[in-house]
Amino acid sequence: MSNESKCPFHQTAGGGTTNRDWWPDQLNLRILHQHSSKSSPDPDFDYAKAFKSLDFQALKKDLTALMTDSQDWWPADFGHYGPLFIRMAWHSAGTYRIGDGRGGAGSGQQRFAPLNSWPDNVSLDKARRLLWPIKQKYGNKISWADLIVLTGNVALESMGFKTFGFSGGRADVWEPDEDVYWGSEKVWLGGDTRYGKDQLKAQAPGQGDLVAEPAKHGEEQNRDLSAERNLENPLAAVQMGLIYVNPEGPEGNPDPVASGKDIRETFGRMAMNDEETVALIAGGHAFGKTHGAGPADNVGPEPEAAGLELQGLGWANKFGTGKGGDAITSGLEVIWTSTPTKWSNEYLNNLFNFEWELTKSPAGAHQWRPKEGKGAGTVPDAHDPGKKHAPSMLTSDLALRFDPIYEPIARRFKDNPDQLADAFARAWYKLIHRDMGPLARYLGPEMPNEELLWQDPLPKADPSTIGEQDIAALKAKVLASGLSVGELVSTAWASASTFRGSDKRGGANGARLRLAPQKGWAANQGVDKVLAALEKIQGEFNNGGKKISLADLIVLAGTAAVEKAAKDAGYSGSVGFRPGRVDASEAQTDVESFAVLEPLADGFRNFSKARYSVKAEKLLLDKAQLLTLTAPELTVLVGGLRVLGANHGGSKLGVFTDKPGTLSNDFFRNLLDMSVEWKPTSADNETFEGRDRKTGQVKWSGSRVDLVFGSHAQLRALSEVYGSSDGADKFVRDFVAAWQKVMELDRFDLK
């Protein structure tokens, strides 16, 4: 008989079949409440203040010393951890994608699942452990998010490269992001769903490394893959668990030209142009090596699947010593140059000076070596001084030589090392700062003086601000302009709601609503009339000596309209407004870069540019999360914007009131009215009409975005709060607070 005591519980809290198991298509409001104060050990902690007290130079000195302080438990290649730390920083920042601004290095997500267990991040668990003594020493003065990126910068400097600069300000979070869509594949390195096909299978399911079984590599080498590769938006990686591309080539097919197409697609989705892409690859591969000393079946589970005794480390390797010269990371065994811990242009020299032939790594992965045995004995071994090798390349490296667009850029960099150094410094800086938002968020002594277009620069604010009397006079002029409450509110919303909490881009500051591309967006139909009227008011006011920006006036006009609507509903009081916004110029606006901010759907205005396979309510939820809204804020804003008449194009969908322009709780009262029966009016169930149950008379029309507030249990519960007889006051207060929040989302100068 077993001596083991029987547990009184079969399962513990949080286990068992969940609502998501029963209803996988259910609207997931949890993404609106992630990273709450309950997950933080210090909700009131001011990271910017703590960072300013950091001895920055002492930290850099410690990081520099770490680079060559090789540890027996994970020895440094070539006696230098620099290349490992460059990869760590790159893979932290490299998850960023322009489509929705999510991913990136901004919150230290590499510490958490799924990123800490991605196949492309093998051995980065060790890199972060090497950093722990330094993180421990400096404590909360440096976040993991900043430390990971700074360490990559210091690594470059320690190997002789002059970086462009570094800015801190990335505050840590304490749990994994739930809002980021990394793809729908269920196996590591799967890619079938993102390309809309079932042909690409996982290469090493469950192992968490890049290496396939040898027999599976290149089975379809001669197949033209170009017609099949239409990567799903907003993804910026070709397979589940990769940062960008498969280094062996598309689907393991060692075709450099096809690889070039994948590289262009994925790097482009991370906001890099062709020159920046070549510079990043050529600069990054000036250092270090890849690791594929043995077969993939030697590698154990990733960190999230590993045993407790491994203490958060994963990929335990039973090949030889499991480390150093026996390390297995990607399964590729490549050393690019003879100076892997020193900045040089040798990577490009080797790429063009040798002719290359296909070979395989010890793990069976496709890679390339110089033909006719050339280059032998010129490259050092990472751990054995008595060994020498020939240089080697990845399929993705050869893309820089054989892609017709990359080749002339790479050749120019080869012949002009100073151009490569400058381009790499700038591209690296962009890579590690792309998701930080405006310069007001940047901290530290190494922030460059040069203003860069991709940072969405703004002119300096006029130190003289308008006063309360000026604000009151401007409100009166706006309300006397003949513009409706709905027009003013909708225009202010169109300006402010481009903000994305993911990469801190967009928002009302800059008044880019009046510039290309925003002025031509379908979602902004009708704002030109409002802008013309506001520009006239602005001109008249500014001729009097004081100045107001159009950015401020757009928000102030919407605020005045909300105040009027509240007053018409019987509520007194003002809506908060803080001036200080500025107007960006066309020269400060990158049209192509801003194009990705275009709202293809905005449920807050009942707008959809087209019919999409994703349900409208899920697009609304995505928008709400990017606006950093909570579920109550989402609910009250939709209900308020509907009765204010802020719908796109004056649509009556969801306007459940007979007094539009008045800030009432009618949307909720009428949606929850059981005397109304709803039925779809379109075959795709996108629009509905509500009829009186007794008379059959049509009372209202609505969209999926409207009806979800009565259908979804959680949203209905919130709607009931605002639709109750005692909910009207709370509705107005909450709407005003949520409105001001959205109007100031990009005001980092106030935070």
From Swiss-Prot:
InterPro entries found in the cross-reference section: Catalase_peroxidase, Haem_peroxidase, Haem_peroxidase_sf, Peroxidases_AS, Peroxidases_heam-ligand_BS
Cofactor binding annotation: Binds 1 heme b (iron(II)-protoporphyrin IX) group per dimer.
Crosslink (Tryptophyl-tyrosyl-methioninium (Trp-Tyr) (with M-270)) position: W90-Y244
GO molecular function, one term: metal ion binding
A Pfam match: peroxidase
Record-annotated site: Transition state stabilizer: R87
Post-translational events: Formation of the three residue Trp-Tyr-Met cross-link is important for the catalase, but not the peroxidase activity of the enzyme.
Keywords linked to the UniProt accession: Heme, Hydrogen peroxide, Iron, Metal-binding, Oxidoreductase, Peroxidase
Protein's job: Bifunctional enzyme with both catalase and broad-spectrum peroxidase activity.
Family according to the record: Belongs to the peroxidase family. Peroxidase/catalase subfamily.
Subunit structure: Homodimer or homotetramer.
PANTHER family documented for this protein: CATALASE-PEROXIDASE, HYDROPEROXIDASE I, BIFUNCTIONAL CATALASE-PEROXIDASE
Name by which UniProt lists this protein: Catalase-peroxidase
Organism expressing this protein natively: Pseudomonas putida (strain GB-1)
Gene behind the chain: katG
